[in-house]
């Protein structure tokens, strides 16, 4: 498959037509579930459609209804009965019954949330997961070429013990990347320690957390191999 990146309609970056490594773990897990799974920030279905094909019932969430309309059109007709569309911005606009989900997938969406929103969001995801359920998270870190100038600031905040060392109020103040208009003004670049803390406070157990370079990441984003952070946790 030829890799393509497509800008999101709501200017929250880009979506890929190739699942990243964390998303591949979610898709593989979807083959074994009996309860529905949730895909937060589903965009055009790079995770949702393969999870449907794996046999799962998928609640596809996105803050842009146009994304969900496109996702539904792209879903093969035989799989559409397994698809439930869930419009709204996480973690504010929708709720799901407690302990009803086998898995939650959130790839390249949590780094647009404030610290308070992350705290609320992890509490919700933990509540929604059934016993034995899995959480799959992928997010951007400060270690990306467009944000290289921010790394010393971030590392100083880490050393000072700040709770949210990767919070960037205005991305235009730390980067001159030519496509900054495709992302929100504020970003929350995440790391292993912050995700570990959020998971623990939500009452989940960490199975694995690691930094890596996604195979679908453009060369213009490459810095030192720690451009992304992945997390798998369980109830």
Task: Report each predicted region and the residues it spans.
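Conserved class I S-adenosyl-L-methionine
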Residues: 136-165
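Class I SAM-dependent methyltransferase "Motif I" SAM/SAH-binding loop
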Residues: 41-43
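Class I SAM-dependent methyltransferase SAM/SAH-binding core
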Residues: 46, 50-92
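A short glycine-rich, Lys/Arg-flanked "PGG" loop and its adjoining helix->strand segment in the class I
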Residues: 119-131
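A conserved beta-strand element that flanks and buttresses the S-adenosyl-L-methionine
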Residues: 105
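Conserved S-adenosyl-L-methionine
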Residues: 205-215
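Acceptor-substrate binding/catalytic loop of class I
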Residues: 113, 179-193
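Conserved alpha-helix/loop element of class I SAM-dependent methyltransferases that forms part
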Residues: 15-34
């Amino acid at each position: 498959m030829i890799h393509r990146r497509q800008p999101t309609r709501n200017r929250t970056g880009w979506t890929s037509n190739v699942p990243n490594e964390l998303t591949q773990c979610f898709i593989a897990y979807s083959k074994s579930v009996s309860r529905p799974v949730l895909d937060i920030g589903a965009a055009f279905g790079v995770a949702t459609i393969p999870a449907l094909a794996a046999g799962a019932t998928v609640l596809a969430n996105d803050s842009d209804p146009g994304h969900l309309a496109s996702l539904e059109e792209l879903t093969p007709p035989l799989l559409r009965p397994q698809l439930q569309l869930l419009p709204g911005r996480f973690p504010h606009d929708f709720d799901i019954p407690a302990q009803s989900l086998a898995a939650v997938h959130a790839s390249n969406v949590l780094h647009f949330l404030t610290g308070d929103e992350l705290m609320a969001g992890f509490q919700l995801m933990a509540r929604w997961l059934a016993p034995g359920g899995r959480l799959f998270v992928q997010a951007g870190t400060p270690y990306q070429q467009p944000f290289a100038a921010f790394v010393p600031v971030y590392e100083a905040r880490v050393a000072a013990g700040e709770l949210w060392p990767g919070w960037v109020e205005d991305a235009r103040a730390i980067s001159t990347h030519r496509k900054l208009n495709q992302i929100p003004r504020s970003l929350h670049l995440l790391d292993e320690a912050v995700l570990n803390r959020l998971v623990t406070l939500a009452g989940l157990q960490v199975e694995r957390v690691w930094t890596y370079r996604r195979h679908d990441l453009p060369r213009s984003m490459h810095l030192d191999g720690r451009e992304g952070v992945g997390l798998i946790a369980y109830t």
